[in-house]
Amino acid sequence: MGPGASSATRRMLALPIDGHLFFAGEATDTEHPATVHGALASGQRAAAEIQAADKPGPIVVIGAGVAGLGAARDLTAFGREVVVVESRQRIGGRVWSDTVGGAPVDLGGSWLHGLRDNPLADLAASLDIDLVHTDYEDAALFDADGRPMEWAHLD
């Protein structure tokens, strides 16, 4: 699926198979695709679909990214037995911070697209995570080699 995919394509990608295999991930979210917000929303949607399918037994969630963790959290809240499997030695999927030169650096999703009606903003607040307002007036732009660029180059 390429950039700019339609909502219909995203809905099709999210369709369950045989009532047993459910899909989540930011690419399946029609309102916030390509965002962490969309990943979380897709996990919540998949969890609701799984619960509505009313199939007995434990549920396996493949992937401990935001979509998988969101689905697992909601399914657990529904009282379901959930096992999350992850291929990496860490959770979070594309949301990842590391230390570079003694300073924390975000290597994945790190920006909330709006605070109003964004469940990630609520989650950040509940975890006492500081949020910093984006100041577009004072933003800097750099090329792939780290050299400063003028914004006019983007026009």
Name each model feature, range by range:
Residues M1-D155:
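FAD-dinucleotide binding site
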